């Protein structure tokens, strides 16, 4: 009769005969003994425990072999794709890379192929990590369908359907509550949870579905704050709240009561250090790595519904939907990373760099050096950034202060950015469509509906099509178009930033403009579904995303979608819904194309520009804070140059490129002129005279989001009284300087009057400085439709109270304004009402 001892000996002999090494034999033996012990402790006889353990070990080895084969196949596919893309860099005309710093460099061209795997570059065929991530996000959020409009974010980022949130948790955990909406959301979430597993496995990863799965994202800051010394309170709470029937070792074994305290000690350290203190891979009898991976995926700790709510209330940030949406964002990143770089992204990234070096070396030492520079300064920091390899310390007071102040300054300073964004995005969309041979833009009606007249319906259509409008699921996103930084920092400051973006129409415009491009794309494909691939004027653009004639034929054979009468789309997501054989691949290509092109037409701050400005420096260090300040508001202009500089390189001839750049430059100069004049009017001033070089220079710079530098064409200081050195240092440094002057200015003046040799009398000007400080840094004070009224009715009144000389100073400033810029005020400073309407005077 089989027993544990005889099976172990038999198994070891068999493994030796099949060529297994000692280390692997020991791993399998340990696994058998662990499973046998589990069954024995569950009440099974020794013989039955050995039999069941034998079955588990063999099943595990079979699954392991299958997963190994699957991962190998995925890696080979990724490797082949990477080699093909790098070879494209070898063969591409070097003239396409004149925008990348090394004129005529083959090494740069080869290394740029690697960078294009992380972020879209139209000079290379295929998808990138960022686009793949958007594809995954869209497919997952689409599963919520109409319910997303009931429990997403509403006006000013407020959570909709708050009363239903606790019941959503209970429904996910299998408890019937009688709440119809909660049931619908829970069912949709469970589909999302299963789909993330399926998508990860299809990409080459290894995950198992979990019944009634509900993620939990505990905040390191709140754990430290409320968890007691060394986590004593947190550990007691977890011992009481965790569902120990479901919280098991990764192999399914029960975690014994005597093992739980040590386990929670290690989990506490891992979660409160944001993963910096990893669980030892040898811990828990070799289960450490698996436990760490499950913690990272929020799949290790399990609670019933009521205890999950207790845990969330005490140790988590945000609400239930924030947790669900956050999990989607995390899994979208991981799935996209595996799709792009295979099951072992770090190893693949190193292989990519090795291939780049090998190919560049064939073209000489200079090409190799140029390639190394791109890998070091672009690829490596971009890869580290998307994988959070140098994440900010979650406990850092300095980091929270820097990011929080960045959000406050965004709220105070970007309230009129929509003056440039709205006309600019229409101009850029027209330029991109011309580049792609897509014809004139016909989506103005859709834009108006998405912005004002039919918002909810357009949001629902977008979500169902796999194009998630970020403001529906995130309380803050629009400011990242300009800074790339507005989605971090203390929650209150994020809300301030987002409130300004929404009230100034920046959020609504960005949402509407991007959806207009996306919907027009799907409508265009529907209208052209009767044409052969070679007859499509925009076929070359499709080929950049790896789309072939066969792909087009498969997509145009789909049943069109008609969300409302007279509106028909050819949607990539229907390739999945209608069970086409290669539906997932079709969806990735066509959806990726639409995502990437919409972000070219309506641009935002890019990953590469952020890395170029900040590297991987963190704002919780002194040098990182200084660099953070320097980079604010410079990310978008640099991104603008990168996006459209490289897009123009798609023209085949030098004259074609120059013509496209000239047309875009002229168009954006007109946009800058319009935005500049609208901004002047919003501040109570007449439009600027336009018959001078200074205005044209300011308009040109404004068209590229550099309007603050345009002021120096008229005067040595800008509208805030800052010189070029202050602008270069960034708003955080300027804020620190102004704060220091406000707090300590009178101290130094008093010391000088008392301790100096002069007889001058000390006069405090702190009140006047405080009003100017508030005028410049009050959140929301720059919102275009409220700015003039706030200036005249609030800040001018306060200035009169704080400074007896305020009226005289205003008259002096008005004369200087007229002398430097040539325009006057239609709403005179200090007056309670406008004296006339704005006038243009030459």
What are these regions (language model features)?
Residues 216-227, 448-455, 657, 802-806, ...:
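Eukaryote-specific, cytoplasm-facing alpha-helical/coiled-coil scaffolding segments in long proteins
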Residues 748-842:
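Hydrophobic alpha-helical segments
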Residues 644-758:
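Short low-complexity linker/loop segments enriched in small residues
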Residues 189-190, 219-327, 331, 335-336:
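Long, charge-dense tracts
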Residues 141, 443-458, 698-702, 758-775:
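Short, mixed-charge aromatic SLiMs
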Residues 2-195, 209, 215-224:
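Low-complexity, small/polar and acidic-rich linker and loop segments
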Residues 300, 304-419, 424-696:
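Hydrophobic, often aromatic-rich secondary-structure segments at membrane interfaces
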